[in-house]
């Protein structure tokens, strides 16, 4: 992050704008939305700047720039067509620790003006760091279209009751829960419809309740999907942004964690092959204890929590402890990996059934019903099977599958790090070694793998 986004109090801010053409005028008009004092210096002024000066909204000096113009200024915009003058002002301002922006010249900018969605008192500011202005305009248009203009009324309503709510609830957590319920319920709807008197009465009624928060939290068992953040469900994202605490494992990507509420506590309990960071029974107890302390806890798991995610064990403990919970399904790794590798798990000409199995190696063996797994016209998917690949291939051949049976391994499915290696039961181990495949990787066995060459749409083979 080269540019750190901040919001500056403009009540006593003195701003200098050098230049008074159309470009400078746009900066002046933007500054006029604030409480800043604005001085403009230029040999001439366009009609807009001249009108604003005549109306007394800005101070205009119709002359050339002088170094003394920087005196007592905290912010400077430079918008002239004299490149040397722009450079000189940049260096002079920087030497005096005055923030300076030379319009459309990023190397000479100590700060940049963001793209703004204004719903005062709610302000959304975005920036591309000057590298993608067209994309930024596109995103702003999207936000403008989905955020109601009347959101500003909600901001004003919240400001009116802020101190009352603060006095009513003695903890930050209880206040946040209260406001989340208000903004997600009927009170907010009344405000957006312009029914302020009704909204205020409803607000007073809610504040008068004996106890808004029971003091008992809840656990949300959330499937984070196979890796790509775009594959999260809406509900998963909504709960992630409500959480007080997030308990996550190794398969949850950094990009997905970035979507969690910024000030939520994050607890890593990740498990890797041969290394269990936190025993499962301790994780189960941790979830219950956190919720019983009044927290909203998101248990974030890669894939789907009920498919080799041990979600059932975790909620059994919650039931025993009397903790409320919700389960949010996620796209399981098998579905994500197969889709992004161009391998349909079922196909009328290849597979009439699909079986999910764990390939986890224990004591150099995998205890599975191999005759059932080694069936023709079937797709078998092995989770956590990379280390056990030699055993899987040996057992499938031993129980009747030809060594020419197609097999594929998909590493880091649905992400930019995805790799796919395809082969057959006889040669796949060598191919995997040559490609340097690492966990997390999924194994797909069956003739559907032969369709990859035709159906692949996401990336190339490793």
Curated annotation (Swiss-Prot):
GO terms for biological process: cobalamin biosynthetic process; methylation; siroheme biosynthetic process. Residues 217-462 are annotated as: Uroporphyrinogen-III C-methyltransferase. It holds the Pfam family CysG_dimeriser. It catalyses: uroporphyrinogen III + 2 S-adenosyl-L-methionine = precorrin-2 + 2 S-adenosyl-L-homocysteine + H(+); precorrin-2 + NAD(+) = sirohydrochlorin + NADH + 2 H(+); siroheme + 2 H(+) = sirohydrochlorin + Fe(2+). S-adenosyl-L-methionine binds at residues 226, 302-304, 307, 332-333, 384, 413. Pathway: Cofactor biosynthesis; adenosylcobalamin biosynthesis; precorrin-2 from uroporphyrinogen III: step 1/1; Cofactor biosynthesis; adenosylcobalamin biosynthesis; sirohydrochlorin from precorrin-2: step 1/1; Porphyrin-containing compound metabolism; siroheme biosynthesis; precorrin-2 from uroporphyrinogen III: step 1/1; Porphyrin-containing compound metabolism; siroheme biosynthesis; siroheme from sirohydrochlorin: step 1/1. It comes from the Bacteria. The keyword Plastid does not apply. The modification Phosphoserine is found at residue 128. The keyword Lyase applies. The active site is at 249 (proton acceptor), 271 (proton donor). Its EC number is 2.1.1.107, 1.3.1.76, 4.99.1.4. One of its GO terms (molecular function) is sirohydrochlorin ferrochelatase activity. Residues 1-203 are annotated as: Precorrin-2 dehydrogenase /sirohydrochlorin ferrochelatase. Keywords: Cobalamin biosynthesis, Lyase, Methyltransferase, Multifunctional enzyme, NAD, Oxidoreductase, Phosphoprotein, Porphyrin biosynthesis, S-adenosyl-L-methionine, Transferase. NAD(+) binds at residues 22-23, 43-44. HAMAP family: Siroheme_synth. Then it catalyzes the NAD-dependent ring dehydrogenation of precorrin-2 to yield sirohydrochlorin. Finally, it catalyzes the ferrochelation of sirohydrochlorin to yield siroheme. In the N-terminal section; belongs to the precorrin-2 dehydrogenase / sirohydrochlorin ferrochelatase family. In the C-terminal section; belongs to the precorrin methyltransferase family. This is Siroheme synthase. It comes from Pseudoalteromonas atlantica (strain T6c / ATCC BAA-1087). The gene is cysG.
